[in-house]
Swiss-Prot record:
Residues forming the catalytic site: C457
Domain Rhodanese: 401-508
Keywords noted in UniProt: Cell cycle, Cell division, Hydrolase, Mitosis, Protein phosphatase
Enzyme class: hydrolase
InterPro entries: MPI_Phosphatase, Rhodanese-like_dom, Rhodanese-like_dom_sf
TM region positions: none
Protein name from the UniProt record: M-phase inducer phosphatase 1-B
Organism: Xenopus laevis (African clawed frog)
Catalytic activity: O-phospho-L-tyrosyl-[protein] + H2O = L-tyrosyl-[protein] + phosphate
SMART domains: RHOD
Region Disordered, residue ranges: 76-98, 285-335
């Protein structure tokens, strides 16, 4: 063993740091296996060489008793050209290049692996998410200055190593922890293990979403970047150095910290509500948590027992002003009730119908009511009279109101010749009605009396109503609304068919010829053709007249 140790010390250092690191690991593993001869059989599964090496490194002493070892320059991890100091000159001469964790480690004696100990591993992919970082609520730490490191490490100047390519990580190490770890006689040692860091990361913090990052976790990240051995170097060497009493004290204090509140500088949101929401938020304090700087979306809920003088005064004034009003309204409620303002929705529908009926009782120019009694018929816009009313009108019963009666028979000539009412005019074409009534409008000789026009056909269902509407439209077109030449127009209900059986004495000849008589089919076709032609011509003339007006 001594010869192999001497040969390894005299071997020249290699330029490749990764190969030197693996060679040293194998050499240390061989030394440990040669020393550990007492354990020949283990009930558990044998450890791999790298795991065995990790267990050996976990029991190594941090202090050499001589010159204290310097902490790595953690601020220059992101710089590829940043130099990393090597071991002391005696280590360099021996040709051994240790890992970043091994710079602080020295063999204290023989090592016998513990059979009950199991290596704690963390997944390589989740290393960044598991490792904690310093929160904003932790005490302020001082960064190790480069000047102090240069003064205390003059003896370590020598061969430099290239820093591996890795993402720069900003770390803040407490000065007290650095002093306690690397001083020859530390007074207070800080015991921080990876397990406790993982537990703290799981608990999290309500203010910062970034997990804290400590020195041990940073070393694990660097080992992972070097050669992928982060899974095997998860145990902190400081846990092995501390005595059982100190570990117990630290574990109890850690339990108190974990069971207590997470933040010692937590600020209640209720206190922030007192801050004015209108205050400018352009200059936010960097130490103020982000969630407390956000604008409040809801109005702050005031306690029920908070009575301001203004509110009390306002309540008293309103209550005092309402009391006399209530006293004044009480007798009015007993005597008379207030009437609601009338709106269109409150009007009774029956009243509206009555008013409409009243307007419908007026003649076309809205100046007088109808002189003859009317009844409802098939066409709601026209006024109907019965045969009895027409017979009374012919007999002169309405002579005091009516000056002259015009009975217009809208049937075809062969129907008119077959039987018609006495004194009726046969006008079955629209042009004939226009020429008779509108070319020279007729007026009553006496203002108190009226001119009445009564239309009818065989049933008063089609031809009579059409002629009545035509005359009203032409009359409206020739006069300014609502003036009319003939404001009073009527329809004989049931037509000649219903009037002839009851009043034959008022018909001449006393007979009845229907429209669809077998003897007058040819004449029926001829008159229908003429009527359609006249209607087409009339529409054409109306269109031409409208174009001329434009």
């Amino acid at each position: 063993m001594a010869e192999s140790h001497i040969m390894s010390s005299e071997a020249p250092p290699k330029t490749n740091t990764g190969l030197n690191f693996r060679t040293n690991c194998r050499m240390v593993l061989n030394l440990l296996r040669e020393k550990d001869c007492s354990v020949t059989f283990s009930p558990e599964q044998p450890l791999t060489p790298v795991t065995d090496l990790a267990v050996g490194f976990s029991n190594l002493s941090t202090f050499s008793g001589e010159t204290p070892k310097r902490c790595l320059d953690l601020s220059n991890l992101g710089d590829e050209t940043a130099p990393l100091p090597t071991e002391s000159p005696d280590r360099i001469s021996s040709g051994k290049v240790e890992s970043p964790k091994a710079q602080f480690v020295q063999f204290d004696g023989l090592f016998t692996p513990d059979l009950g100990w199991k290596a704690k591993k963390c997944p390589r992919g989740n290393m960044n998410s598991v490792l904690p970082r310093l929160l904003c609520s932790t005490p302020s730490f001082k960064k190790t200055s480069g000047g102090q490191r240069s003064v205390s490490n003059k003896e370590n100047e020598g061969e430099l190593f290239k820093s591996p390519n890795c993402k720069p990580v900003a770390l803040l190490l407490p000065q007290e922890v650095v002093d306690s770890q690397f001083s020859p006689t530390p007074e207070n040692k800080v015991d921080i293990s990876l397990d406790e860091d993982c537990e703290m990361n799981i608990l999290g913090s309500p203010i910062s979403a970034d997990p804290p990052c400590l020195d041990g976790a940073h070393d694990d990240i660097k080992m992972q970047n070097l050669d992928g051995f982060a899974d095997f170097f998860s145990v902190d060497e400081e846990e092995m150095e501390n005595p059982p009493g100190a570990v117990g004290n630290l574990s109890s204090s850690m339990a108190i910290l974990l069971s207590g509140p997470l933040l010692n500088q937590d600020i209640e949101v209720s206190n922030v509500n007192n801050i004015s929401l209108n205050r400018s938020r352009l200059y936010r304090s960097p130490s103020m948590p982000e969630k407390l700087d956000r604008p409040m979306l809801k109005r702050p809920v005031r306690p029920l027992d908070s009575e301001t003088p203004v509110r009390v005064k306002r309540r008293r004034s309103t209550s005092s002003s309402l009391q006399p009003q209530e006293e004044n309204f009480q007798p009015q409620r007993r005597g008379t009730s207030l009437k609601k303002t009338l709106s269109l929705c409150d009007v009774d529908i029956s009243t509206v119908l009555d008013e409409d009926c009243g307007h419908r009782q007026l003649i076309g120019d809205f100046t007088k009511v109808y002189a003859l009694p009317t009844v409802t018929g098939r066409h709601q816009d026209l006024r109907y009279i019965t045969g009895e009313t027409l017979a009374a009108l012919i007999h002169g019963d309405f002579s005091s109101l009516v000056e002259k009666i015009f009975i217009i028979d809208c049937r075809y000539p062969y129907e008119y010749d077959g039987g018609h009412i006495k004194g009726a005019l046969n006008l079955h074409r629209q042009e004939e009605v226009t020429d008779y009534f509108l070319k020279q409008p007729l007026t009553p000789t006496m203002a108190q009396k009226r001119l009445i026009i009564i239309f009818h056909c065989e049933f008063s269902s089609e031809r009579g109503p059409k002629m009545c509407r035509f005359l009203r439209e032409e009359d409206r077109a020739r006069n300014e609304y609502p003036s009319l030449y003939y404001p009073e127009l009527y329809l004989l209900k049931g037509g000649y068919k219903d009037f002839f059986p009851e009043y034959k004495e008022l018909c001449e000849p006393q007979s009845y010829c229907p429209m669809h008589h077998q003897d007058f089919r040819e004449e029926l076709l001829k008159f229908r053709t003429k009527c359609k032609t006249s209607v087409g011509d009339r529409k054409r003339r109306e269109q031409i007249a409208r174009i001329m007006k434009l």
